[in-house]
Amino acid sequence: MGPLQREGRPALGDANVAPGSSPGGVWHQPQPPKDSAFHPMGWSLPKEKGLILCLWNKFCRWFHRRESWAQSRDEQNLLQQKRIWESPLLLAAKENNVQALIKLLKFEGCEVHQKGAMGETALHIAALYDNLEAAMVLMEAAPELVFEPMTSELYEGQTALHIAVINQNVNLVRALLARGASVSARATGSVFHYRPHNLIYYGEHPLSFAACVGSEEIVRLLIEHGADIRAQDSLGNTVLHILILQPNKTFACQMYNLLLSYDGGDHLKSLELVPNNQGLTPFKLAGVEGNIVMFQHLMQKRKHIQWTYGPLTSTLYDLTEIDSSGDDQSLLELIVTTKKREARQILDQTPVKELVSLKWKRYGRPYFCVLGAIYVLYIICFTMCCVYRPLKPRITNRTNPRDNTLLQQKLLQEAYVTPKDDLRLVGELVSIVGAVIILLVEIPDIFRLGVTRFFGQTILGGPFHVIIVTYAFMVLVTMVMRLTNSDGEVVPMSFALVLGWCNVMYFARGFQMLGPFTIMIQKMIFGDLMRFCWLMAVVILGFASAFYIIFQTEDPDELGHFYDYPMALFSTFELFLTIIDGPANYDVDLPFMYSITYAAFAIIATLLMLNLLIAMMGDTHWRVAHERDELWRAQVVATTVMLERKLPRCLWPRSGICGREYGLGDRWFLRVEDRQDLNRQRIRRYAQAFQQQDDLYSEDLEKDSGEKLEMARPFGAYLSFPTPSVSRSTSRSSTNWDRLRQGALRKDLQGIINRGLEDGEGWEYQI
């Protein structure tokens, strides 16, 4: 027993001694009382305090979850390197030291299956550092390492094949596949999840890894060895879904085509129609994510060119998954309900733009105008019913000199007697029926979209949905109070009037001039004004308390604005909004601190905070003004989808052409005539001429590099250019002509060559 070992307790090295006992006898750990919680420091706590401590610990863990996750990830990476340096086998695999590996593997005490801090084997490390020779030695000595996955929470399930694929080590991939590596292994660690703090999302299978890094050779190898192109990860995403989410759009389109070339066999459904867990196909996911490149690439597969007549082209576009008719989760509805701004750019793409324009002009705008007119008549009817509500002279005597009430509400038996009352009753019934219809229309959408999405989406008119639902409830509350002869019906009636008339602004979205302004008002109220109210509340609370303390010892008859604390708060609020001036009686002596406090309040409230609010609103106006066309298109789509969903099919026929009548199957199509600019064809011819000149120019440079540039460029045989002038206009024209030439020769700007014509000073080249 060591000198520091407590008597009666086992030493730390006594592995055969059971916990709670000692070699010389039995030692029992003291048990806490049944009605208390045991603290780790050794004393007992009451059960209630133990529960509070447990809840506090859970709250702390929840609050620091993200920071602790990042810190844990950093610590594990450092521990991984430390573990590699401590293990000769892992270090030899990292440094590709084949001789050391052979010696270690021949040693009987060497554990070939030893793992590092991440649960990785030596083969994982060799694959991570692209050490093919070391990996071959390890696979020869222990072939079962090929099937070993990593076991840490971060990289759980990752095999050496995953690492070789993502590093695009083709030779190592071939070696692993030759030794039976599983092509269906799934990497399910937290690093591979689709989360904001993860930099990459490549799915879980080796095939999706290969497709995302753009290795065509590895993709073919994996498919030839039995990789399932229809495999889905934990989110239900196939490899096509995962390609949609990649930032590199160019090779994503190439991999998309390559994978589709392997789709076929006995499957009845195309790989492009396989949905994920959210019910989104790759095409819909491209629209929701705002991936314009992939969306246009997929639309090229869906279009059928009928004929071309000079600059005119007639094209049939397949409306499957785009049109909201007959699809509960169409692309149009997904775009207007998503929170990503990039998705709204899809609304300006063909054929979505043409489909929305057709629906809006043919059905949406007329029905929306009729609906707006009906609502205005309805709210006028409700207003008249409120204005002429049943009142009678007051019967009771006044008991308070401040009470100036002359009329009071009639009882239910007295409210409907005269012909005027009957006319008002008709209007009240119309108001109640309208409120019930509003709730029947709005409540199903709340359950379908969810409360957060339905009331929080500005494009869907979220705040207006809150207004109209609250209005309907206020009307029903007013009805209940009228039927029960309850006093105070003026409260819900007043709220209903304000909310009902404010909802008229919702119908401004039907006009391009007024629609964006409704969004501007929403953003100012729920963005700028809400933040400003927090600052205003702090300032008012501070200065109201100061004013109350200053006038606390004064005569309230002389200085009545601050005689109690609630009145001080209200008076300070009026001062803040400059409704009243300094509410002080200057005929008497005022406290010295009043002048100082009021001067500071005037500077902070009037000069600083009100101008801050104006600046914030101006910034919001500037941002919304730059998006007004895009926002209005989104409003039109949201309104069109809403009307199409609510109206019966007989009032809203399906748009487009049914393919069944023309031998195109059961799909619906939209015919679009497009006129191509002939200047593009001219620019292409110029581009070809310039390309030939560049080839000749490069050949001349190789023959004689000592000649001058003007002598080496044989432009005269092809194009004649004006002699450069020193004037500003000629110099500018020459500069833009050179930009045109450079833009025409770039491979990645075909079709958008005119972007090269923009001048730095805002001048545009005219063709």
Swiss-Prot record:
- GO term, biological process aspect, one: parathyroid hormone secretion
Q: What is the lineage of its organism?
A: Eukaryota, Metazoa, Chordata, Craniata, Vertebrata
Q: Which residues lie on this side of the membrane: Cytoplasmic?
A: 1-366, 448-462, 509-528, 617-767
Q: Write out the residues that bind Ca(2+).
A: D581
Q: Which organism is it from?
A: Rattus norvegicus
Q: What does this protein do?
A: Calcium selective cation channel that mediates Ca(2+) uptake in various tissues, including the intestine. Important for normal Ca(2+) ion homeostasis in the body, including bone and skin. The channel is activated by low internal calcium level, probably including intracellular calcium store depletion, and the current exhibits an inward rectification. Inactivation includes both a rapid Ca(2+)-dependent and a slower Ca(2+)-calmodulin-dependent mechanism; the latter may be regulated by phosphorylation. In vitro, is slowly inhibited by Mg(2+) in a voltage-independent manner.
Q: Which residues lie on this side of the membrane: Extracellular?
A: 388-424, 483-488, 552-564, 585-595
Which protein are we looking at?
Answer: Transient receptor potential cation channel subfamily V member 6
An example of a Pfam family matching this protein is Ank_2
Question: What stretches lie in the bilayer without crossing it?
Answer: 565-584
Q: Does the keyword Repeat apply?
A: yes
User: Manganese as a keyword?
Assistant: no
Map out region (Interaction with calmodulin) in residue numbers.
133-143, 689-707
Q: Which gene encodes it?
A: Trpv6
Q: What tissue specificity does the UniProt entry give?
A: Expressed in duodenum, proximal jejunum, cecum, and colon.
> Which residues, if any, are the signal sequence?
none
Region named Interaction with S100A10:
637-641
What the entry lists under PROSITE patterns is as follows:
ANK_REP_REGION (PS50297), ANK_REPEAT (PS50088)
Disordered: annotated span: 1-33
ANK repeat segments: 84-114, 118-147, 156-185, 202-231, 235-276, 278-307
